[in-house]
Amino acid sequence: MTTAELHYKIDWRASGHYPGHHASMQKGGGLQFRNHAALINAPDPRRFDVHASLRDPFEQVQVRVYRQTSAIPVYVIADLSASMSFVGASAKMHVMADFVAGLSDSATRTGDRFGFVGCAEATSDEWLLPATMNRAAGAELAERLRAYQPRGLSSQALLSAADSLGGRRALVFLVSDFHFPAPLLAQVLSALAYHDVVPVMLWDRHEHERLPRFGLVRVFDHETHGSRLLLMRPGLRRRIQERFAVQRKQLFDVFAQHGRLPLLMEDGFDADEVTRYFFG
């Protein structure tokens, strides 16, 4: 199976020592000029700067110092609660699996490490992948997700997911349908504030927009965390659509308060859509 190619970027300087693709705070062999330094402090005569040396009031030999490009950790924190079992135009877990496959492949090609934390009412070692450069690990994880039927009773473990990310700042993709209370989302985003968080919102138009006017429809019940059959009628259809519109506004308000609008996927996984999110 061919993995769709996607691209991402960060707007901050990485602090890691490992060479990679991203702008960094580290000195090294990159092409971006950082500053001048005395040769005794930066002993690389190949970068001797005659003009800076002549201007130096202390008559010290000056060399150019450059920034290296560094690698970063890239994580997916995934909601594995029961609402993620919804199947409409496509299964939400299939969309997540495609996204994980594309992101893990892109990360390892870029020189970044990819990790994964799956969350429901609790975290589980079964769904914990420490950040790794092993491309096969991401592909194997994606296939497991594709076959998985989530049954989690809540998304509460998202609150503690940051504990599994390590001490370095990471680019974190928070993947969920966010069918849980807005105050919990605000707490989750606050817990992840140290990291660069991209919310990935997996909705399906068959959940709300493309409901039939009449007929039997299987819907997810947020109170029982299970599915049930409803006899759809125009009034019920309108109420469901209004509820989704209110929820969408609440979610976007919380995301905006934390400085990042979501990457919305309503029509399945599209690698180009992910790339446009970062590069416009």
Model-derived features: where do they sit?
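A conditional alpha-helix N-cap/helix-loop micro-motif detector
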Residues: 96-97, 151-155, 244
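Von Willebrand factor type A / integrin I
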Residues: 1-25, 167-168, 180, 186-280
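Short beta-strand-loop
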Residues: 118-144
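Von Willebrand factor
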Residues: 134-170, 183, 202-204
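An amphipathic, basic-hydrophobic helix/alpha-beta surface used to engage anionic
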Residues: 1-126, 171-175, 181, 207-208
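Solvent-exposed, conformationally flexible loop/turn segments
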Residues: 42-45, 135, 267
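Short, contiguous clusters of charged residues that form electrostatic/catalytic patches at enzyme active sites
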Residues: 98, 102, 155-160, 249
